Regions:
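Glycine-rich phosphate-binding loops of nucleotide-dependent enzymes
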Residues: 2-250
């Protein structure tokens, strides 16, 4: 039986003072689908996904996840619903090592009465998850601030995937990684698609989006200007919508 979209965003808007960062945006994401949110820097992409993940509360509009309205839910509550987000700034604690970041706020405990953290189990869990994702991190005890951009991205992705995400949002995940890191990320997205886990993939790179997403939602100046299946459009057409030289047909 068709359960409908796992994520439904309906008419959401967000203001910061007199600036309308997101203006009446709607879209849906179905199981096993990779949807690209595409637009230039400053278009409102990150603000949009932060409303979905619970960081911001929409000023207008509604969001549903798995058939439930998410109004008032915090990022922690969204994670408990297994919607995981990898933010553009990665949201890592630089003074902690990889395993502590992966388990941050969800630490493994030796003793639930005295709240003693089980560092060994956390280290083993972090190592296994990073290995599964094919991210190389020679020293799990190194502080996150001392890691390369690709290694930091690997920790952020491992933090999301360790908890068996049902839905993953990735905000410009390849911005600070090299070629090998990009390959790992593209493979992860493909593997999630095969498992039926939907992905919202945020990027300003149209060619990158065309290589991995099923459907493109173009955001320009806070508004959704067009939505296209990538197999039914071209890179040039989508670029035209991004820069404003093309208009969606009414």
């Amino acid at each position: 039986m068709d359960r409908g979209p796992l994520l439904k965003v309906e008419g959401v808007s967000k203001h910061f003072g007199g600036v309308k960062a997101v203006d009446n945006v709607s879209f849906e994401v179905n199981a096993g689908e990779v949807v690209g949110i595409i637009g230039d820097n400053g278009a409102g992409k990150s603000t949009l996904i932060k409303m979905i993940s619970g960081v911001y509360v929409p000023d207008e509009g509604k969001i549903w996840f798995d058939g439930k309205e998410t109004e008032g839910k915090s990022p922690r509550e969204m994670r408990e619903m297994r919607l995981e987000t990898i933010y553009q700034d990665l949201a890592l604690a630089d003074n902690l090592d990889a395993s502590s970041n992966i388990f941050l706020g969800r630490e493994k405990l030796k003793n639930r009465v005295f709240k003693t953290v089980d560092r060994g189990r956390m280290m083993d869990g972090a190592r296994d998850t990073l290995k599964t994702l094919a991210f190389q991190l020679p020293n799990l005890k190194r502080l996150t601030r001392d890691l390369s951009g690709g290694q930091r991205q690997g920790v952020a992705i491992a933090r999301a995937m360790h908890w068996n995400a049902r839905f993953l949002i990735m905000d410009e995940p390849t911005a600070a990684v090299g070629v090998a890191g990009r390959r790992n990320i593209y493979k992860l997205v493909g593997d999630l698609r095969e498992k039926g886990v939907p992905v919202v993939y945020v990027t300003p790179n149209v060619r990158e989006a065309f290589s991995i997403v099923d459907r493109a939602v173009v955001i320009r100046r806070g508004r959704k200007v067009v939505e296209r299946m990538v197999k039914e459009t071209t890179v040039d057409e989508i670029v035209g919508f991004i820069v404003g030289s093309r208009k969606a047909e009414e």
